[in-house]
Regions:
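Extracellular adhesion/carbohydrate-binding repeat motifs centered on closely spaced tryptophans
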Residues: 2-231
Length: 231
């Protein structure tokens, strides 16, 4: 009788354990904890520092406390919106993941990862991003390209202030200008017309644009009046 009772007890214990395991497995998924969402694994523990999909099949990130991250950087190279959804194919203005005092523009690609280190064509326009993913503006790439305040690479004629010359610690002004701005011409590739980008050797470059000839100096400023040229 004792042996029979032990068998019954063991069977009951196994059944109870099985039910507990089934309940734990069924509990895996999203749950509310106070005012925030968490994700519980099959053992009833919060998932931390990992991505999980919601019922809408969109990715969300669980931070170090196991809470769903919102409106912040996630996993270093990604960003989640106010609903916790991973941003993709979208511009975001925020502070850098690495710190900073001002909000700046970033672009997150199709995979959700921030674009870094180079040029990226977005909606038909070219943009340049640094090693942190910050969208660049102004003169760049050895002052051969110009990016507007919107970050887009400019082409054609542009009336601009000259690039800042760090070696001279001053602006590289050429011929006198009343407002400190000069005409520059940028090819369809975005590259500035100047002596270093032309076929000529010397202080000036002469180029035909829309049927007319123009002269540019070594910095790319369009010249007016008399210009002394060797040869």
């Amino acid at each position: 009788m004792k042996t029979k009772g032990l068998k019954v007890l063991t069977a009951a214990a196994v059944l109870s354990l099985g039910l507990m395991t089934m309940e734990a497995l069924a509990a895996e998924g999203w749950a509310m904890s106070g005012n925030t969402w968490v994700y519980m694994d099959q053992y009833g523990n919060r998932v931390t520092n990992e991505w999980r999909k919601g019922a809408d099949n969109l990715w969300r990130y669980l931070n170090g406390n196991g809470e769903m991250a919102v409106s912040c950087w996630a996993d270093e190279d990604y960003f989640v919106d106010s609903n916790g959804i991973m941003v993709a194919n979208k511009w975001v203005k925020t502070r850098s993941y690495y710190g900073g005092d001002e909000d700046v523009w970033f672009y997150f690609g199709n995979s959700g990862k921030v674009v870094k280190d180079g040029w990226k064509k977005i909606d038909g326009r070219n943009y340049l991003f640094d090693s942190e993913g910050v969208m660049q503006t102004g003169w760049t790439e050895d002052n051969l390209y110009y990016l507007g305040s919107d970050g887009a690479m400019k082409t054609g004629w542009r009336y601009l202030e000259p690039p800042y010359d760090e070696d001279e610690d001053d602006y590289t002004y050429g011929p006198e200008s009343d407002d400190g701005q000069y005409w520059y011409y940028f090819a369809p590739s975005g590259k500035k017309y100047c002596t270093s980008t032309g076929d000529e050797e010397g202080e000036y470059r002469v180029s035909r644009i829309d049927g007319k000839y123009y002269c540019f100096d070594s910095t790319g400023k369009m010249q007016t009046g008399w210009v002394y040229m060797d040869g």
